[in-house]
Every structure is written in C-alpha cells, then in structure tokens.
Amino acid sequence: VSIENVDKPTLSQTDCICRILPLLFEFPVLLTAAATFVEKSYKNNITFVVGADTIARIGEDRYYNDEFSVDDAISVFSAKGIRFVVFGREMSELQHTGATTKGHFQSLKSLGLPSTLTKLCISVEESSFRSDLSSRDLR
C-alpha cells in the first residue's frame, strides 16, 4: 500500500490503517512511502494489484525523466520478477477515472501497452470482476 503517489496526496496514518487492516490477516502487506513503481520494486518477486488506469500510466513516458525511460522501468520489473494483476476500469479517453470522467471500460488487452509490459501482467477479466468506483470515490 502506497503512502505516497505521484498523482495523489500523501495518506494519513488513519488512512493507512483503514486500508491495510482488512488485508493484514490474510495477505502479506507492504506499506511504502515510495511514490513510483520502480521505487517500490526494491524487493524481488512482488505482485502489485492495480487498475487499468495505473498500468496505463506505468507505460507512459511522461511518468519518467530523461535519464530513466519506460523501457528502463520495464527492464527493472522484469529482472526483479515484478508482476501486476490488472483490473479493468471505466476510463475517459485521457485514461482518467472517477465520477466526473466517465468513458468506456478498458481492460489490459485494450490499452495498447508495450508487449514487454503486458507480459508482466495478469488480467482480471470484466466477467470476473467489475466495479466502476474509483479509489477517490471510495475514500
């Protein structure tokens, strides 16, 4: 669970407790202040559970600087055995989610990500799970 995120405000201690408590007795949970997935990948063989909007951002150049590219990030993920379980999301054409940006449902397959990133992903199909609530709406 991320305390910090490049696109969102920092979580409070109360928010962190509320997020990890339901998971704590069933799954190992890592709480981190790392803002990017490359920073979060300091351990090997981590599986991240993300929405289609998040994996789309991971595959975008604008989230990296001139010295570190999307391809560099994917190489780090691959070398460290990082995997992503990806849930589809209702997204606008700009890949935004939430109540004010309705669009169409996007799954891992419909995003057009680099194949090297897609190979690191496990897709959860819409028929298995769909919720159109954004994390912002849940908070």
Where are the language model's segments positioned?
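Nucleotidyltransferase catalytic core that binds NTPs
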Residues: 1-139
